């Protein structure tokens, strides 16, 4: 499979991500007893977004010098589209985390610890999923049609099917975990495991971490095929995806207090998924350029946010 990713680009990306992760973990480790404040979350969100844009600029410059301006423009638009897609779809992931932390009564200072390991695990799992997906696409090009159909069905289902409101503790997988793993009734600070009466017990914190990882894999099943609709270049797919999820922890603490106000978001995301699915299904008849995909995704998100603001204002007026 043709890829813009040269050893220099792969190496630069790996070094940059490693340095930023170590810096982030080092700074957060000094404040492990504190919850991330809204201000800290905002600062880190700006840092991660700025770093992503700087990477896009560096990618454009490198491609311009090596393969020409046209390819540079195309690759950067693909990166930005993938990044925006992942950021948008990740908001739903944030809502699931909020429900998990609320159900298991995890305090904010311990949420930070869970999300640190959660994001690190997501990096590993998504890397494996993306390379597996790239291999499948390179071997079986028709699989893109399956991705497209899956995204179209998922988009329609997201808009029309009512969400499952049953308690998290009643979910089959949670019941299975509790039946097969010794879990303490109470939290033990930041510890994932404790010994009681000579036996090793898991704390509720490790249960939440497992569920956080599972939720990320479930959402990745939607987001990764969506990015393959934009580009099949594994370098662009991986870098756009990882840059988006690296800022996910900061996004969580940024949105935690206002999550209930995003009532219309799922409809916007459903339209995006349906659009991407249709784009993949009609690829042989009509090719939507990358710039068109980027514009469509950005426009759908913008319209969704405007409608969301209007709905919230209307509800506030009705409640007065």
Curated annotation (Swiss-Prot):
Q: Where found in the cell? A: Cell inner membrane
Database matches in InterPro entries: Integral_membrane_TerC, Integral_membrane_TerC_rswitch
Q: Which gene encodes it?
A: alx
Q: Which NCBIfam families match?
A: R_switched_Alx (TIGR03718)
Q: An example Gene Ontology cellular component term from the record?
A: plasma membrane
What is this protein's record name?
Putative membrane-bound redox modulator Alx
Tell me, in a sentence or two, what this protein's role is: Has been proposed to be a redox modulator.
The beginning of the lineage is: Bacteria, Pseudomonadati, Pseudomonadota, Gammaproteobacteria, Enterobacterales
Query: Per the UniProt record, which residue ranges are transmembrane?
Result: 3-23, 41-61, 88-108, 114-134, 136-156, 199-219, 226-246, 271-291, 292-312
């Amino acid at each position: 499979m043709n890829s813009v990713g040269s050893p220099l680009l792969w190496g630069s990306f790996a070094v940059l991500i490693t340095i930023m992760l170590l810096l982030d973990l080092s700074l957060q480790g000094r404040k492990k007893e504190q919850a991330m404040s809204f201000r800290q979350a905002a600062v880190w969100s700006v840092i991660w977004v700025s770093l992503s844009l700087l990477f896009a600029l560096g990618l454009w410059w490198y491609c311009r010098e090596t393969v020409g301006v046209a390819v540079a423009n195309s690759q950067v638009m693909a990166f930005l589209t993938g990044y925006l897609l992942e950021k948008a779809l990740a908001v739903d992931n944030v809502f699931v985390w909020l429900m998990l932390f609320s159900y298991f009564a995890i305090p904010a200072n311990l949420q930070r610890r869970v999300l640190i390991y959660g994001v690190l695990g997501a990096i590993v799992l998504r890397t494996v999923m993306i390379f597996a997906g790239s291999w499948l696409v390179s071997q079986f090009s028709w699989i893109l049609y399956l991705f497209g159909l899956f995204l179209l069905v998922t988009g329609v289902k997201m808009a029309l099917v009512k969400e499952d409101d049953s308690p998290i503790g009643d979910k089959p997988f949670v019941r299975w975990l509790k039946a097969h793993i010794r879990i303490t009734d109470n939290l033990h600070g930041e510890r994932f495991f404790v010994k009681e009466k000579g036996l090793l017990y898991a704390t509720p914190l490790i249960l939440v971490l497992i569920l956080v990882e599972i939720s990320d894999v479930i959402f990745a099943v939607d987001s990764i095929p969506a990015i393959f609709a934009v580009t099949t270049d594994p370098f662009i797919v991986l870098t756009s995806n990882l840059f988006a999820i690296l800022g996910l922890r900061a996004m969580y603490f940024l949105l935690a207090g206002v999550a209930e106000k995003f009532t219309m978001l799922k409809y916007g995301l459903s339209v995006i998924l349906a659009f991407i699915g249709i784009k993949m299904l009609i690829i042989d008849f009509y090719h939507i350029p990358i710039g068109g995909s980027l514009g469509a995704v950005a426009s759908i998100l913008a319209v969704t946010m405007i409608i969301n603001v209007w709905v919230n204002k209307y509800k506030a007026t009705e409640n007065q």
